[in-house]
């Protein structure tokens, strides 16, 4: 698919170098954890929020296919402009009234921030209505491992189990349970300690849920500041933006084209 999106050659050189630098570190850490296994089993999710479509096109032309966005409208607009074999991941705070708009995106691959039964049901219902022939959306349940009030996510066992129950029910056909996701606290992510306790908490939730429901959940944890430790503690995915694209502009100055 030709998008007609052009880009600067200097920016291309810079972005590819930065992407490959991060990829190299991810692979090196993964090989230490997954001995004799393919290090590419760790997904490097490229977080492209507030970055122009031209930056995404550069990395797409380099072979990258999975990108993460934090804002519903931005994801929708970029999905219309960019190749339709991109796998879009929504990783921002999810509002129930935005589930319908998200579900309309045919190549929406994943929603990583399900934090209530109501949102899970609304997303399933909306996908069934607007894109019933597309693949089910892979979903992560967001866990608030740091118990910070300003953070989204569940930490109540009954509520978590209720959401998992729905995903495994006959009713839930258009979205699919993939794993658990967390955003650790800033302070913990910047501590010079051997183990990130927020990540350790997510690992414990995985063990508890897998034991109760017979699942085999994947973990999504780790961003630019703490992805190395996340890999060591068992994540299947790291979400990296700044280390690849550089600093983000203020939201009111960001442009899609």
From Swiss-Prot:
GO terms for cellular component: cytoplasm; nucleus
Gene3D superfamilies: Alanine racemase
Protein origin, superkingdom: Eukaryota
Repeat keyword on record: no
InterPro entries attached to this UniProt entry: Ala_racemase_N, PLP-binding_barrel, PyrdxlP_homeostasis
Disulfide bond annotation, renumbered to this chain: none
Keywords tagged on the record: Acetylation, Cytoplasm, Nucleus, Pyridoxal phosphate
GO biological process: vitamin B6 metabolic process
Residues modified as N-acetylserine: 2
Gene Ontology terms for molecular function: pyridoxal phosphate binding
Protein location: Cytoplasm; Nucleus
Chain's role: Pyridoxal 5'-phosphate (PLP)-binding protein, which may be involved in intracellular homeostatic regulation of pyridoxal 5'-phosphate (PLP), the active form of vitamin B6.
PANTHER family, alphabetized: PROLINE SYNTHETASE CO-TRANSCRIBED BACTERIAL HOMOLOG PROTEIN, PYRIDOXAL PHOSPHATE HOMEOSTASIS PROTEIN
Family: Belongs to the pyridoxal phosphate-binding protein YggS/PROSC family.
Protein name from the UniProt record: Pyridoxal phosphate homeostasis protein
Source species of the chain: Saccharomyces cerevisiae (strain ATCC 204508 / S288c) (Baker's yeast)
